[in-house]
Amino acid sequence: MEIINCHVHSFTQAHTPDRFLPWPVPLLVRIPLVRRILRWVARLVDRDRKSALGRYAQIIDTSYKRTQREVFEIVRGFYPEGTRFVLLPMDMTKMNAGSVAVGIDAQHAEIVALRSAYPDSIVIPFAAVDPRHEGVVEKTIALIEQDDFRGLKLYPPTGYHPYDPRLWPLYEYAQEHNLPVLTHCSRPASVQYRGKPTPEMLTDPDSGELLDLGRFELLTRFTDPDAYKPMLKKYPKLRVCLAHFGGAGDWTRYLDKPWHSETERPNMSWLAKILDMLRADTYQTCGPTSATPSTPTMSTFTFSKCCSLTRE
């Protein structure tokens, strides 16, 4: 049986700004002594690393590896020989949380080298895209055509609408070449824009409406399943994967109040919204692509879910 882990992050602390997590966690864990104390406390109270503290300690420990290859080797060690991995870079340079030591272009370049270092295409790289970067369309297409990247990775909570017009050429290209677009879909997003919303962020690109929302509500709107409907309407064959399937909190909400008992859509769990999209005549699940030839349409993994949608 072939195994494909469809959601792997290999970035290190060099790719993250000082305030990418709530203050003062990122600043404190940059101090080696603090990390050692955290590891000691985590082992003391949670030997199996099953609690939130244990998981965070493991994440911090791993992120302080020097290279993405070191991080990847840790992940790979948990899987049998022949397992393939979808690598999803994260672009945190525009989230107004401080500068990063290594930008997204260099992060992509390291993934290119990482992919070349392993046989049998066990590394399946996606390209992180952010419409605020100049040349994002040309650079992304070059990664796909020259370096064999297999899809697009979005993370709208860092400060942009998923339907931003600057991304339309990439969506058209992805639709034409049957490439998947994987986007973050859970709330609250732990990695998110830290500044005051800009006029650009507060303008809905579909309706032109000026949104009267605070930062948290705005960023939540960016990754709401409903935010992808204009995209699917404009690009009816675009393959969109809503990573985490709404998130663990919305799965809990769904179990408390299933989709059929909801009365107001704004109050629906995101799981319910996604299930409605899958059940509707307008949408259908879609099969594998050349990027992930044996990946099932719905992939389940610990603490998160993923599904693909296309519009008929």
Language-model features: locations:
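Mid-domain alpha/beta scaffold segments of enzyme catalytic cores
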Residues: 1-176
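Catalytic pocket-lining loop regions of alpha/beta-barrel enzymes
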Residues: 150-151, 161-312
